[in-house]
């Protein structure tokens, strides 16, 4: 029998303490110097949203150039087992995946192996959807949502659980007719990005999932991410919920999409932070350049008109925040909602993930608030407060009940118990009292609807 000495015991104990300390440190990341108050304001805002909207888990990361300024999880990764969410909780990040697919194509473009403006048949000879127009479909169009292809592939899409291959998904698109002439209009298309990813699979004779792991995720250093679930991913994947207007809550389905390149990335916010660091280092990763600076600049430049703060670049949605160009993408897939934003000029970024279906209005609001705080902090300004709401006074709520018409918008306001509901032909959302008046405030919509009073008249405003 091996003798276990007191010295061995203390060595063993030291190792355990060290490992446990590392584990605790890796779960959440404390704010760096100067970001302490920013983190406190965000903690308050996130806890408010979780409590008021009955959410499972939210994780957020802030990026300041090549540093994680703060990262933390809130709520429960697994509510039944009471496992708390943290910064390394894994989420399905939906359409944020598109940015990675497009970057993989751009790696090959800068090597001269792919031309974005060649007809797609140059690379996929059998991909011939019905195109009654003279303008051919190209990769550039598909990556900036200007191809005219239908939004969803006929198979392997968000609404089917067939779990077919990427090849079969792309083949299902071929019998379809273009919705618009290529380049004429912006039409968001998951089908198009499925074709983009399939192009990589065909040209380089490697399954898309393996290709992306080697050429994108590993090069960025996203060691806790993947385009298909594995044991490591599943062990940290948040338990996600679906919900309905009649208050039913049920577990989100876990089937894989056939259109993998458009929405199948699994990642924690700490790995999304590494992606944003690539954007701020002009394409340089931990093992060299993932993408060249000039190629990255093309990705964040407007395609087919528009400006640096409007429309799409290659993959990236372009907008404005605080006078700066803001780039990013949202993501929505069964049970999960994500928002990623970056401001390249000042190298600030944020990613927010939620494990409740169609809660994108919340991840978007929180992400924009995070950027507001970071900008105010940078400029030594007073940090703004988060917009919070409360139930509408019962007497006022009763006076709001009725049918509203504004242009093509038809809506009803109903009082249900203590809650005031706005019901349109496409959504139902609570109306609540804020400091600036009555606004929509629910999982599905935040502030897009307002009630304005002019004299004795009430009007419904849709922003």
Where are these regions (language model features)?
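Catalytic-loop motifs flanking and including active-site residues across diverse enzymes
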Residues: 10, 97-101, 138, 192-195, ...
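Bacterial N-terminal signal peptides
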Residues: 10-20
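Active-site-proximal loop and beta-strand segments within enzyme catalytic domains
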Residues: 29, 47, 76-190, 197, ...
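Catalytic loop of the DD-peptidase/beta-lactamase superfamily, centered on the K-T-G motif
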Residues: 22-72, 201-206, 210-214, 218, ...
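Short coil/turn segments at secondary-structure boundaries
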Residues: 61-62, 154-159, 184-186, 228-231, ...
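Bacterial N-terminal signal peptides that target proteins for export
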Residues: 1-9
């Amino acid at each position: 029998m091996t003798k276990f000495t007191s010295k061995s015991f203390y060595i063993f104990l030291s190792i355990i303490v060290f490992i446990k300390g590392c584990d605790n440190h890796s779960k959440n990341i404390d704010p760096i110097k100067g970001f302490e108050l920013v983190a406190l304001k965000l903690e308050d805002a996130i806890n408010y949203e979780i409590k008021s909207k009955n959410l499972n888990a939210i994780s957020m990361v802030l990026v300041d150039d090549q540093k994680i300024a703060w990262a933390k999880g809130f709520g429960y990764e697994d509510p039944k087992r009471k496992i708390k969410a943290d910064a390394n909780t894994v989420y399905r990040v939906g359409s944020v995946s598109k940015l990675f697919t497009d970057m993989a194509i751009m790696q090959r473009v800068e090597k001269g192996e792919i031309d974005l403006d060649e007809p797609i048949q140059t690379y996929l000879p059998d991909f011939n959807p019905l195109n009654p127009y003279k303008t051919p479909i190209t990769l550039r169009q598909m990556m900036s949502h200007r191809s005219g292809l239908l939004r969803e592939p006929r198979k392997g899409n968000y609404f089917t659980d067939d779990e077919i291959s990427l090849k079969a998904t792309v083949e299902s698109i071929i019998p379809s007719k273009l919705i618009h002439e290529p380049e004429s209009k912006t039409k968001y298309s998951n089908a198009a990005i499925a074709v983009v990813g399939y192009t990589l699979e065909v040209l380089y004779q490697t399954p898309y999932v393996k290709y992306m792991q080697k050429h994108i995720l590993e090069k960025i250093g996203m060691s806790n991410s993947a385009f298909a679930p594995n044991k490591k991913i599943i062990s940290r994947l948040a338990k996600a919920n679906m919900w309905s207007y009649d208050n039913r809550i049920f577990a989100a389905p876990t089937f894989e999409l056939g259109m993998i390149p458009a929405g199948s990335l699994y990642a924690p916010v700490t790995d999304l932070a590494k992606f944003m660091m690539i954007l701020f280092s002009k394409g340089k990763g931990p093992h060299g350049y993932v993408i060249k600076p000039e190629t990255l600049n093309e990705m964040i430049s407007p395609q087919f008109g528009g400006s640096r703060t409007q429309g799409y670049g290659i993959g990236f949605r372009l907008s404005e925040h605080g006078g700066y160009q803001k780039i990013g993408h949202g993501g929505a897939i069964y049970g999960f909602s994500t928002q990623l934003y970056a401001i390249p000029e000042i190298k600030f970024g944020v990613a927010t993930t939620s494990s409740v279906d169609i809660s994108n209005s919340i991840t978007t609001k929180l992400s924009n608030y995070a950027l507001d705080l970071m900008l105010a902090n940078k400029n030594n300004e007073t940090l703004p407060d988060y917009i919070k709401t409360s139930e509408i006074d019962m007497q006022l709520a009763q006076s709001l009940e009725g049918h509203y018409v504004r242009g093509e918008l038809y809506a009803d306001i109903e009082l249900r118990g203590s809650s005031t509901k706005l019901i349109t032909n496409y959504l139902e959302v609570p109306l609540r009292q804020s400091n600036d008046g009555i606004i929509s405030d629910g999982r599905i919509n935040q502030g897009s609807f307002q009630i304005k009073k002019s004299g004795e008249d009430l009007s419904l405003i849709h922003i």
